[in-house]
Curated annotation (Swiss-Prot):
SUPFAM superfamilies: L9 N-domain-like, Ribosomal protein L9 C-domain. One of its GO terms (biological process) is translation. Residues 181-191 have a biased composition (Acidic residues). This is Large ribosomal subunit protein bL9. Keywords: Ribonucleoprotein, Ribosomal protein, RNA-binding, rRNA-binding. Belongs to the bacterial ribosomal protein bL9 family. Pfam families: Ribosomal_L9_C, Ribosomal_L9_N. It comes from Bradyrhizobium sp. (strain BTAi1 / ATCC BAA-1182). Binds to the 23S rRNA. GO terms for cellular component: ribonucleoprotein complex; ribosome. Residues 178-197 are annotated as: Disordered. Disulfide bonds: none annotated. PROSITE patterns: RIBOSOMAL_L9. InterPro entries: Ribosomal_bL9 (IPR000244), Ribosomal_bL9/RNase_H1_N (IPR009027), Ribosomal_bL9_bac/chp (IPR020594), Ribosomal_bL9_C (IPR020069), Ribosomal_bL9_C_sf (IPR036791), Ribosomal_bL9_N (IPR020070), Ribosomal_bL9_N_sf (IPR036935).
Length: 197
């Protein structure tokens, strides 16, 4: 089916272009959401009549979206989740979680505006793109951590899996265990046991 786009649609075309799409996509998405009109002679004439109004509305919406993008751009959102020692999350962080975290920060976006290739399944930072308008995109940094303290360390760029403090504590534990366990003494006891038999 051929349709006339009433606004820019990602990976499809610009406003005013006549594009050929599958019937289901046209009926269930483009026409239903008023993003396009069927490309009939009558609708082509109708589009030409409302072209100036559509362009003016698009410029106005784009300006408002640019203001919102300025407010959002570069924000750092922290999401606290339970995770294993290796940093794998028990569950995942999805688009819905990001939208809720943004709303808690005073930013209202809808789920289709947040572009996330796959759910986040590990602790760390990830840049997420938000399409506020078909022509205006911005990004936020999502930090997933086990605690607020850990989130701060991740933001500073520390490698949380191999912290120096953890390595020092492990070395102290090994040294303390060495006081209770002397491998040479065990060898002497084993040798004494063999001679007694």
């Amino acid at each position: 089916m051929e349709v006339i786009l009433l606004e820019r649609v990602a990976k499809l075309g610009q406003m005013g272009e006549i594009v050929k799409v599958k019937d289901g996509f046209a009926r269930n998405f483009l026409l239903k959401r008023k993003k396009a009109l069927r490309a009939t002679a009558e609708n082509k004439a109708k589009y030409e009549g409302m072209k100036a109004e559509l362009e003016a509305n698009n410029i106005k919406a784009k300006g408002e979206a640019a203001k919102v993008a300025e407010k959002i751009d570069g924000r750092d959102i922290v999401i606290i989740r339970q995770a294993s020692e290796s940093g794998q999350l028990f569950g995942s962080v999805s688009v819905r979680d990001i939208v809720v975290a943004l709303a808690a920060d005073g930013i209202t976006v809808s789920r289709p505006q947040v572009w996330l290739d796959a759910p986040i399944k590990a602790i760390g930072q990830q840049k997420i793109t938000i399409a506020i308008h078909p022509e205006v995109e911005t990004s936020v940094t999502v930090t997933v951590a086990r605690s607020a303290d850990e989130a701060e360390r991740i933001k500073r760029g520390e490698d949380i899996s191999t912290r120096q403090e953890d390595r020092d504590a492990a070395a102290e534990a090994i040294a303390a265990a060495g006081e209770f366990f002397d491998p040479e003494a065990q060898e002497d006891e084993a040798a004494a046991g063999e001679t007694a038999q």
